[in-house]
């Protein structure tokens, strides 16, 4: 996945916003909370996303994936896709959607309601 494809996908998720911060990283948010980050790799795009505890344990040892620099060292369950083989584009999209879901569930009930999220 290219950085442009990553951005198009993240933008397609409801109510997302994009900012550039942390030394030029592209940061995607839902309700003001980060769910995905692009950048930080010179040779290839690097994509960072939040995971469940189980997914974190499974993914951290896979080739092309690692605990996300800065975030995982603080005890947060974030994975960075930084090299091939990593995840397929379809696999990365699934994890990005799951990151979006996890982060949206952490928003206040008021914010979720304002955004029309998690109303099931």
Question: Which residues are covered by each model-predicted region?
Answer:
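Charge-dense, helix-prone N-terminal extensions
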Residues: 1-120
